[in-house]
Amino acid sequence: MRKTSLALAISALLSALPIASVQANESCTPLTGKEAGLDTGRSSAVRCLPGINPLQDLLNSGQNAFSPRGGMAGNDLNLWWAHRTEVLGQGINVAVVDDGLAIAHPDLADNVRPGSKNVVTGGSDPTPTDPDRCPRHSVSGIIAAVDNSIGTLGVAPRVQLQGFNLLDDNIQQLQKDWLYALGQRRHRRQPGLQPELRMSLVDPEGANGLDQVQLDRLFEQRTQHASAAYIKAAGTAFSRIAAGNYVAQPHRNLPKLPFENSNIDPSNSNFWNLVVRAINADGVRSSYSSVGSNVFLSAPGGEYGTDAPAMVTTDLPGCDMGYNRVDDPSTNRLHNNPQLDASCDYNGVMNGTSSATPNTTGAMVLMAPYPDLSVRDLRDLLARNATRLDANQGPVQINYTAANGERRQVTGLEGWERNAAGLWYSPSYGFGLVDVNKTQPCSRQPRTAATTGAVALAKGKGNGRSPSAPSRYVGSSPTRSSTQVDQPLTVEAVQVMVSLDHQRLPDLLIELVSPSGTRSVLLNPNNSLVGQSLDRQQLGYVRTKGLRDMRMLSHKFYGEPAHGEWRLEVTDVANAAAQVSLLDRRTNTRSTLTEGNNSQPGQLLDWSRGYSVLGHDAARS
């Protein structure tokens, strides 16, 4: 045990650090939860947390988290009322599946329960031994750092933790280990925190591979029958991605669209994964955060901790391990600062949707003590009570010249829009920022909503497959194909599985239109599917003809009626040469990859075969 705790050191140094004056404080008294007329919002006059609080995800008062500046007060999970009424995650187990968990860390040891697994050694201690394997250990602190007046505080500080190092570089990832970590040993209402997989996103990947199908089935079964919740990171490649020896990013003159659309990763288009993207301390999308129609919620993720606040959380213990170490200096004032953290057990630079995901996990845990709620009930409550951030966010428009010479403008990605069921949705924020205090009282009330029953599935039928039809050629005017849903369902989400041929996939805008007229961008143009261009440059031939069973998910139609005609639209919105900037990581040299326009039109092959509306009986809504 350290002689000087981080919490005490922060208290002693407050006069020297430009931290906002409104801080959590020791006079912040417990509440019963029965106080009449109490304002539990983010601007409440009684908003506070006990102790000295450097954690803007729990209570953002504008503090700087040891970075040069603070954020905008109120952009947090709004959980102060839940914590002060002793809703702290008691009796809930969380499995963190990633690259390790230091089970002896002073902020985590009291919350670690038996059942962890080190896949490398076969033992029960998944503590990382590689000094660079730190991100997911930091994740555990965001969820479950215990309230011991030593260091940081987790969203659910009395939750129980297990760790599985499935993403350790020293192992072969076997399907049996994934199935064990994600599916077996589950207790009722056990959130499973899924990793942010670092997969290549330059080539499309179908969702019908055996491994993906097995995991999809597992997630469905455990969610439906064992009340397990799976929370997944949207990705951190809004502006650039790593692909082999290169870092690729769009040319600087393109409209500000996401390079990585979160739907490109097939695990992100699984309905049973609740996909989360990150906001920063100013209450807008974190600069790195991937977005897409599959995003369900937003949660704090921060920036990099050097220019603006990141997360303050646990680090691998010791000054030669993790983020906070003597051989890796940082401008974040927590790092290499013996007055604050002599043992280097904490860091102030954790960020990413890998931070937003544990924040959401902890928030769901705080709803979990109510066993009558299904996981879909919890999702419904979180969506309907989320806060609409960046409310004036508008669409990103694309201008292009059609084949007939006409100038056209289309929406490459929507801003905030209200669907036909009256719910606000944005692919950049999902339904909005998690609000624990607003949601938690609703979770105490008996649920009569249809989300308490089994999920209903509607398949489309109609003209979704006709490879030889001339109307299926993909050009500069929308190629439209429709399918009919006859079941009277209320939509929770829609999945489509698209197959098409095209020589330059980043040119394509793919949209889905509901019977109510709501339009959702499933895949934006100017995206990261540049594998065809890289192949031509490096191999002289192309391995990818187009999309094959690429699954995409949209939550934008939540609450709308499913009955009626659904329409897929595919448009080629570029006919000039396209450019991608490349950084060769071996030589640190930069180049520009230039690709001419496709020499022949694309062709939509199929989409209704994998089309599904997931929802519930409209009569029960």
From Swiss-Prot:
Outline the segment boundaries, as ranges, of region: Disordered: 114-133, 457-485
Tell me where in this chain the Peptidase S8 domain is found: 68-440
Q: Which domain of life is it from?
A: Bacteria
Q: Name one GO biological process term.
A: protein processing
User: Which residues belong to any copy of the P/Homo B domain?
Assistant: 454-619
Say which family it is in. Answer: Belongs to the peptidase S8 family.
Output this protein's name.
Microbial serine proteinase
- Which organism encodes this protein? Aeromonas salmonicida
